[in-house]
Amino acid sequence: MVSPAQIAGHVFDPDDPGKRFVVELLIDGVPVGIARANLRNADLLRDEPNYRDGDFCHGFVFSIDPATHGVARQIEVRLANRGDVLAPPLLAPALDSGLAPLGGSANRDGAVRWLGGLRFNGWLAPAAGDESRIRALVDGQIVAEALASHWVQFGDCGETTRARGFDLSLPDHFADGRARQAQILDDHERELPGSPCAFVAFEDGLARFIDKHASLQRQTPRAKLFDRRAPQSLPFSMFAQWRDRFPDARLPPQDAPPPKVAVALIGERGIEASVASLEAQEVCDWVAAVLEGGGGETAFHNESLREFLDGDAKDCELVAFAPCGAVFQPTALAQLARALSRFPAAPGVYGDFTLAGEGGEWPVALSAFGYERMLEQGAGALLFALPTPVARAAVAGGAENLFRLFNFSQDGRPAPKAGPSSAPAATPVHQPGFLARLPRLDVAAATRALTEANRAHFSARRIRVEMAPGSGALFPAVRVRRPAPRGKVSVLIPTRDRVDLLEPCLEALFATADLALHEVIVLDNDSTDPETLAYFARLVQSGVRVIRVGGPFNFAKIINKGASIAVGHYLLLLNNDVEALEAGWLDEMLGRIAEPDVGAVGATLLWPGGVVQHGGVVLGPSFAAGHAFNERIDGDPGYADLLCATHEVSAVTAACLLTNRRLFLELGGFDSVHFPVNFNDVDYCLKLRAKGLRIVQSVHAKLLHRESASRGLDRRADQKDRFARELDHLRAIWGAVLCADPYYNPALSLDDFPFSALAWPPRPLQARQNVSPPPRPMPPGF
């Protein structure tokens, strides 16, 4: 018997009616409940032809958590400890609960779900006020509160709503390995759909818990998978507690101590705090100087640095740079030095840091090196170290601020006309871990300094660019415009019927981009709607190519067909539910792909309600791939100003993706076997990355995306099975990079909302360069 709230049944042995069985309930293969089948169930058992001479006490009942509805794929009941399935698995939609998962259209009274560990998130009804609060109760006691402080978008198929979202974490004393339930209430004492939520958390994750118990260590691989699927996290506001629990790693013993480090502090304020922290350095010898005269925290007189390098620092192998007022962690200099010793050919090393603020310290966890973010934000240039020969060369080249010192090593990058075969420039090393607390910047002064540094850098590369100040909140922001390269663009737009989407998509495309030299190809996947077919006829008369691609919906196959008949130098993949918002977006994307080492460019996509739908793809959340900044509204600077600066990512969505057609065909296009609908774009981008090419996410190309309005979300049983199968393929082929995205920091959480919390515990904070592993070959049929 099945209902939205319960699953009931009975189990007996015809040869031994007095025997009682224990059964367990599994959701998506994970045991979530256990019961003894001893309830009286006479009415049903009388109809069993094989039942006789018993007391009818063989029944069981399981209650179903409402949070399961719309999220679980299948539910089944088995004999405990034996694995015998009592009945065919139930598909969760058969429960007919009327609820939908986060992002669905049914939960208009709000929703909540457990993200893993002690973290929950969700939204309130759209009518909720700006100061609405959420409360969490465990065993009837209020244990946590949170303000609904950000935005989310829910709904699909063209009907979307913006609502207040919340993020809530329970106190850490609940991380004791015990399974519990939390009730989540709004400020009207109403329980949100999805509540109560079952949760379990461990002090340092399940894998570390098992490592402490010898009898359980055979379960370590499963525990690691659990930690990836249900990762634990801690809010940024609790950084002090996080650091106390996970202090920066002690330096491993080495035969030789690190070299003496010269430290150049830029500016005038806070020198006492900086010197005190240098005097507390462990292992590493140092000498320091304060460089003034340039104005602000990033500029200095060139001659003053030259004198320091020729004088007190002449015997140092390494020169570290930071704004005056930086407070270094005790092992900061040694960690920078040893990171460079691991990568002796690298031109420098930079580290993560915290920013001082009224609410304490706020962690800035950086990615591995990204050229675009260096240009538009100066990322890496506030806490870094250079080999002394590199520092001397930069000074000889006229460097007068931190940004020019840092970007000097990239002057040798190949010019756009050099072609993709040119050797790439060596890139700096990233040392994760928060090595220092930095003072807040004068953003306007830093933006001017970054502009000057970029001007010198592009002059050295002999590239003509235009630059304009951006609107950074914490860091400098400079928009860099490269000339759009010559070459035809083939715009590929798959569709099936839905003229209501396709027509505004094309109207916006023609209104915002000069397509006289380009071609537009509509890929028709078996449309039958008369209005759509009539529209196709009008498109053909206007010069648009309409190509029929028949058969079941296979996005990868459709795109591959379009690429095979396209004649453009570039391919622009564009969903039929995407609408351009303003002119210049295509030239922006073309300017980025002009660099010879760029393989693909993606745009920032917004839902109709103004919430960010796509800000790049992050690898690893829930051991999968997810969109960044889904909880941010347009105009929000994003974590560490990432929505203010174009930057690199491991992948971008094919809803709006620009790539070189020759590259696309060389790599075999999209994989239509393993990724017919989902993750084909991620797989393609990772193949580009494995070739040493960069994937750029532009914040200056913004388009509207009515996500899945055309084909709908994957909710049917067959669609969910397909999604699960494609996700299994992604994990099998690209598991190594899913565990270590170079554009994501090991100190950040891996739950479903990237850049929103700290990982508990952090992943290994090892020095790294920006490399991507090759795919793992997978035999057919696996």
Language-model features: where?
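Basic, ligand-binding patches in group-transfer machinery
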Residues: 1-258, 280, 499, 503, ...
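Conserved donor NDP-sugar-binding/catalytic core segment of glycosyltransferases
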Residues: 331-363, 426, 578-623
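Glycine-rich, basic loop-to-helix element that forms the pyrophosphate-binding segment
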Residues: 297-312, 549-566
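Short aromatic/hydrophobic "clamp" motif used to bind/position activated sugar donors
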Residues: 319, 571
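Non-catalytic membrane-proximal stalk/linker segments that position and tether the catalytic domains
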Residues: 91-107, 193-261, 266, 274, ...
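A recurrent flexible, glycine/aromatic-enriched loop bordering the glycosyltransferase active site
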Residues: 362-391, 556-557, 564, 620-662
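A short, conserved alpha-helix in the catalytic core of glycosyltransferases
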Residues: 390, 398-434, 438, 585-589, ...
